[in-house]
């Protein structure tokens, strides 16, 4: 028994010593954060190293890019929370109504995403520094914060674009700091690192999920449904730091608490920026309207979504002059994002109970009393089958529930094709019915609303995106409740048998899917 006790004590001592001696990014990578850009695979190496040292970290590879780079998440919390991590996750889904049952835990989930634009190059560097601080067992303050939250950290949403930029920059950079923006290292050639392998902007793909990175990430997102999501970006070298609260237009579906928590986060982060003597701005440029961003998509899924914008971008490199002659360094840019990330962790800890309570209230309202103008949407059965199939695929990706209609007459609604209100129509079992009385009510209403309300004439992106228009479908929106009668059987296309030796093909064209024959 004494030998067993001694062995257990020795094992605990060795484990504790290993974690206590956790290497810093500088010790592991061989250079100070901000001295050069880290290749994606070296970031993965560091995350794997830290996760191997700390039992309170779960590292997940949730997918891979077109160029076969791994997409990873790091999940961190206290030992108590990590021991019941799956219960916390499923309890959170119960809160949304996506799973049945009553939750027994009250732990909010704080998700932070970096480098959706590859050449907004500080993102992954800041993620590395943030990860080290969150994983450091000797940081008593942070470890106390982790008792009241689960943190999910995605260090690089767009590894292909990120490496396209960092590989180019590391090849062209001077041996000494060269802040002159006319030098080669400050003039990235086409196509640049902003987009992914197929030159698609992943920051516009949250709702549509056209790209593999988005498809794989959103599958994970739907499994957790966080209370908080921070989306870390960069802007031009002459811009100061942007933090929430956001600018107008602000979508009418946003709740008072979502606005309030943006203010809470902004005030706390501004406090630290004031202490550091750093410039920042709020309530300008970055609005909350278009539904496929890393702030609005979480907002329409019940979270507090926030964009964070550091000044610098790919042009700044590891250091560049701005318009007033100051040198904007990579290390100072890391400090900006690092400060905002830890501010979010601090405020999640301080408001953990309310984040969970308001989140649960949000989804209860969705299912029982949706507040949007339209309560139901009908896609007519005679619509283009290929386009209907694409729409249903999109709804499935976003967890939006739908079903088939029944034979009903005397209905009136907004007709998308004509733009007229109170148009009489009837339904049949060939139609698709999407009710707003469901967990994904807000996202449903936002994606289908024909005319989003605008309170400001200047917006950051497009102002209309209604799905019936996007897919060219005959559809109606009702201001009354209409429930589906059962599951809808998706249209399938039977393969055409080709006989003989064809010299050409003639196929009906109703959508891009008809090219696959």
Predicted regions mapped to residue ranges:
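Bacterial Sec-dependent N-terminal signal peptides
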Residues: 1-24
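Aromatic- and acidic-residue-enriched carbohydrate-binding clefts of CAZyme catalytic domains
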Residues: 182-200
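Aromatic- and acidic-residue-enriched segments that line the glycan-binding/catalytic groove
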Residues: 163-180
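Intrinsic-disorder/low-complexity accessory segments
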Residues: 21-121, 125-137, 142-150, 198, ...
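Short, conserved secondary-structure transition motifs
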Residues: 149-165
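Active-site-proximal loop/turn and secondary-structure-junction residues that shape catalytic pockets
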Residues: 157-159, 234-236, 312
């Amino acid at each position: 028994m004494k030998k067993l006790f001694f062995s257990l004590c020795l094992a605990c001592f060795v484990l504790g010593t290993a974690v206590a001696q956790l290497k810093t990014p500088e010790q592991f990578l061989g250079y100070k954060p901000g001295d050069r850009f880290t290749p994606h695979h070296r970031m993965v190496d560091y995350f794997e190293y830290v996760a191997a040292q700390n039992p309170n970290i779960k590292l997940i590879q949730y997918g891979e890019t077109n160029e076969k780079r791994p997409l990873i998440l790091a999940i961190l919390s206290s030992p108590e929370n990590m021991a019941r991590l799956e219960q916390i996750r499923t309890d959170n889904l119960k809160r949304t109504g996506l799973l049945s049952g009553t939750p027994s835990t009250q732990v909010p989930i704080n998700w932070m995403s970096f480098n959706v634009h590859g050449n907004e190059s500080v993102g992954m560097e800041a993620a590395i520094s943030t990860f080290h601080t969150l994983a450091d067992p000797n940081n008593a303050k942070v470890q106390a914060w982790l008792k009241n939250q689960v943190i999910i950290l995605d260090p690089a949403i767009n590894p292909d674009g990120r490496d396209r930029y960092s590989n180019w920059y590391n090849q062209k950079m001077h041996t000494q700091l060269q802040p002159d923006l006319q030098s080669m290292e400050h003039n990235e050639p086409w196509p640049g690192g902003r987009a992914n392998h197929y030159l698609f902007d992943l920051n516009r793909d949250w709702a549509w999920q056209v790209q593999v990175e988005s498809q794989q990430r959103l599958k994970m997102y739907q499994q957790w449904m966080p209370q908080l999501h921070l989306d870390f970006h960069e802007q031009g070298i002459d811009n100061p730091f942007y933090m929430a609260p956001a600018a107008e237009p602000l979508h009418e579906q946003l709740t008072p608490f979502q606005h309030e928590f943006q203010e809470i986060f902004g005030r706390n982060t501004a406090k630290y920026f004031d202490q550091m003597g750093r410039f920042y701005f709020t309530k300008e440029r970055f609005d909350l309207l278009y539904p496929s961003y890393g702030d609005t998509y979480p907002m329409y899924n019940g979270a507090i979504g926030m964009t964070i914008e550091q000044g610098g971008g790919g042009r700044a490199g590891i250091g560049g002059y701005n318009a007033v002659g100051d040198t904007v360094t990579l290390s100072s840019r890391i400090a900006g994002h690092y400060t905002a990330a830890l501010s979010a962790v601090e405020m999640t800890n301080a408001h953990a109970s309310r984040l969970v309570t308001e989140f649960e209230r949000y989804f209860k309202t969705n299912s029982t009393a949706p507040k949007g103008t339209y309560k139901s949407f009908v896609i007519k059965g005679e619509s283009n089958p290929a386009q209907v199939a694409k729409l249903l695929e999109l709804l499935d990706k976003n967890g939006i529930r739908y079903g088939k209609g029944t034979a009903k007459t005397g209905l009136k609604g907004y007709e998308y094709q004509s733009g007229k209100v109170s148009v009489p129509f009837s339904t049949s079992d060939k139609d698709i019915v999407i009710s707003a009385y469901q967990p994904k009510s807000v996202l449903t209403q936002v994606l289908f609303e024909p005319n989003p309300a605008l309170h400001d004439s200047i917006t950051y992106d497009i102002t209309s995106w209604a799905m019936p228009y996007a897919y060219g479908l005959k559809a109606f929106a009702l201001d009354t409740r209409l429930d589906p009668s059962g599951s809808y059987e998706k249209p399938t296309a039977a393969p055409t048998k080709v006989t003989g030796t064809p010299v050409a093909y003639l196929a009906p064209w109703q959508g891009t899917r008809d090219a696959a024959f």
